[in-house]
Amino acid sequence: MITFLLLFPTFVDDFNKLLIESEKVHLKPNERLNTELRIFALIRLGITDSVKIAQFLRYSVTTIYNYRTKARNKAACNRDEFEKYVMQIGSLEQ
């Protein structure tokens, strides 16, 4: 995931801009990406199938589904468009 942050250095800040103020992600010291950010980093890379994300991160499909749903519920933008906006992070379409 370090390489991901080299490709998308503002990912965490841009992801937080999509969330309501009280729900923004706060990383622990020395933490680059937490579980939620790892899931959405993979989505940003185009891996949107929860089964594939679960296999890659070694979580259950239910866990991935729950993280995705919780993030959509914390969105400052339209819930149904949230993942579309995640896909635009770091692109010229922003």
Positions of predicted regions on the chain:
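Cytosolic nucleotide-binding catalytic cores of signal-transduction proteins
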Residues: 2-94
